Every structure is written in structure tokens, then in C-alpha cells.
């Protein structure tokens, strides 16, 4: 049985960072914005924080996940995590989260120059983090950071990365073009 294609909206407004330069939400503001996004605007998913950033972020995530669990939205609350074996997963669990968006390197340039690792070494580290997350019942989506440059520079790197993740229990592989490198014609 085929399912119809569906566009799923994920809002990242609450994840303080480059997408919200100069903006920082208090824990109460974060929870209020999350309520509006999920209750009123009916956004499918929201990424509300980066793991391990601060106590303020922890407080904001705890407040938001507590509300979300009471209202049946907990599976729609997502937190950016890192390839750090257990540290991000433990932080997310402590904050009451159940979904991690794992930031991985989507270009050979980032993998070799930022991590100083080969793709195989990076995949080994990713699998270690994924295994720990799954053992703790955390659902994981994966971001391929800089994939658009990676695809333009060395498409096989991106294909090999996706192939290396396809049997690892990843719910979604996300391909954000945060730098605006690709045009719609190039990705559709």
C-alpha cells in the first residue's frame, strides 16, 4: 500500500544559533512559542534546542517537554544532538526529550578538515551514538551538515554517507541547504 507524499514542516526558530542571530529565548518564552507552534499553527515538528548548551536551555527544554507530554506532543519535540556517543543522548533524556536530530558531516571537506577523520571513521562514531540512542529509546533523525557543498564537490561522499546510515535505524535523513547553495532545480 502506497502512501501519498506529504510535506512535513519542522520549525527551528527555538534552536538558538545562526538561524536566529542575536535572539535568545528565556525558558518561559521558549515554552510559549512551542505551544503556539504546535497548538495553534499545527507545525508537525519543532527543534527547540541544541543539547549541552546551557542550564537555561536545559530548563527551557524540560518545561517544554513536560507540557508536550501532557498534551500528546512529545514525539514532535526535537533537540539537536552531536556525535558524542552518550553525552547528547543523556542530556536529551534528562531534559525529558525523546527525539534527537543528530548533526553529522555531509561533506568530505567538513569531515576531513573539521573532524580530521575519514568517512569510515565518522560513520563508526555515528553508529556508536546511534546505538546508545536506540538502547535508550531515543528516536534519531540525522542532519547531513554542508551536504549541498558536499554533493557539488564530491557526490559519492554524500551517497556513501547515506548508504552507511540506511540500515542504522535512522527515522529521517535531513538535507538542509543552510547556505543556499542549491537551487530547487538542482535538488528536485
Language model regions located:
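Alpha/beta enzyme core
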Residues: 4-9, 15-45, 66-72, 85-141, ...
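Short catalytic-loop micro-motif centered on adjacent basic/acidic residues
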Residues: 45-50, 76-79, 175
